[in-house]
């Protein structure tokens, strides 16, 4: 079973997280950042993962540390749960529309972390959430999961819709990339390792 769990406590945040890659879309997300709670909930649903997150942080300062640290811990657990990556498809991509918005996410579970993001959010905030934290979360997730992550919002005018479409597309792309393909024998790389 491809799953991992951890607890991470710093002077800024306290996070417990359990991830099951081959799940049913079951989420139990409790964070001090309501918008991230919403994004993680739909990420779980659309990726068919099972995810439990309990995250508390110094949100009296701002949402940065909590959002960043959730990305770090989720990335670490994603990498751990994938194990040796034998038999996976490795690559995944998804287009997701949300009303006027169209987002595209492409991933390679390559062990070469990179984030390429093309998204111009028209608003700096969604509610109280700073939209610049989306990049921070995605970069930390990609870095710790050691994946190549490309995010493109082709168009859109509503910042909430744009971010939501990104998280849904990322979930669907990761679901595809982590799928076990019976045609893949061993590691999906000519190098013999990822």
Swiss-Prot record:
Question: What start and end residues bound the annotated signal peptide?
Answer: none
> Where, subcellularly, is it found?
Cytoplasm
| Catalyzed reaction equations | D-erythro-1-(imidazol-4-yl)glycerol 3-phosphate = 3-(imidazol-4-yl)-2-oxopropyl phosphate + H2O
For this UniProt entry, the molecular function terms from Gene Ontology, in alphabetical order, are: imidazoleglycerol-phosphate dehydratase activity
Where does this protein chiefly localize? cytoplasm
The pathway this protein participates in, as annotated, is: Amino-acid biosynthesis; L-histidine biosynthesis; L-histidine from 5-phospho-alpha-D-ribose 1-diphosphate: step 6/9
Would you name any one GO CC term?
Answer: cytoplasm
Print the keywords alphabetically: Amino-acid biosynthesis, Cytoplasm, Histidine biosynthesis, Lyase
One matching Pfam family: IGPD
Biological process (GO) annotations held by this record are: L-histidine biosynthetic process
State the EC number(s): 4.2.1.19
Q: Which family does it belong to?
A: Belongs to the imidazoleglycerol-phosphate dehydratase family.
Q: HAMAP family, from UniProt?
A: HisB (MF_00076)
Q: What is this protein called?
A: Imidazoleglycerol-phosphate dehydratase
